[in-house]
Amino acid sequence: MKIQLIAVGQKMPDWVKVGFEEYQRRFPKDMPFELIEIPAGKRGKNADIKRILEQEGKAMLAAAGKGKVVTLDIPGKPWTTEQLASQLEAWKNDGRDVCLLIGGPEGLSPECKAAAEKSWSLSPLTLPHPMVRVIVAESLYRAWSLTTNHPYHRE
């Protein structure tokens, strides 16, 4: 199983890249974790946001291919570390790749939300999208460590 984090936006600050890569490199070879960046549509005062969301959504779903789509969205379901670890095990047993979708400034397209098999809420707060990349990477690594009795996660 491969985990793909599919996110709208490129050219993130250095701290985002460093933070994400710190956890990305820790994943085992049998569970690769990769980042796919989708270019954000050009936004301006007269931008057609509905059209931009639709284009970003199509690109995200194309990148996901046949993978299991999981959206990161405020109205999604919050998971504890233990619940995420159980979810990770279920995904591994399913055998399909898992594609976690992070939208842009206006969130995810309706098509992405409709395609999602699950929706995960990190917080009821609106979080900066660059920060979400690092939080997701750390959370998934922590969940993996729990499933393998690795000492990273402590009760």
From Swiss-Prot:
It comes from the Bacteria. Keywords: Cytoplasm, Methyltransferase, rRNA processing, S-adenosyl-L-methionine, Transferase. Coiled coil: none annotated. It catalyses: pseudouridine(1915) in 23S rRNA + S-adenosyl-L-methionine = N(3)-methylpseudouridine(1915) in 23S rRNA + S-adenosyl-L-homocysteine + H(+). GO terms for cellular component: cytoplasm. InterPro entries: Alpha/beta_knot_MTases (IPR029028), RlmH-like (IPR003742), tRNA_m1G_MTases_N (IPR029026). One of its GO terms (molecular function) is rRNA (pseudouridine-N3-)-methyltransferase activity. It is found in: Cytoplasm. The keyword Oxidoreductase does not apply. Its EC number is 2.1.1.177. The keyword Transferase applies. It is an enzyme of class 2 (transferase). S-adenosyl-L-methionine binds at L72, G103, L122, S123, P124, L125, T126, L127. Homodimer. Belongs to the RNA methyltransferase RlmH family. Specifically methylates the pseudouridine at position 1915 (m3Psi1915) in 23S rRNA. PANTHER family: METHYLTRANSFERASE, RIBOSOMAL RNA LARGE SUBUNIT METHYLTRANSFERASE H. This is Ribosomal RNA large subunit methyltransferase H. It comes from Actinobacillus pleuropneumoniae serotype 3 (strain JL03). The lineage of its organism: Bacteria, Pseudomonadati, Pseudomonadota, Gammaproteobacteria, Pasteurellales.
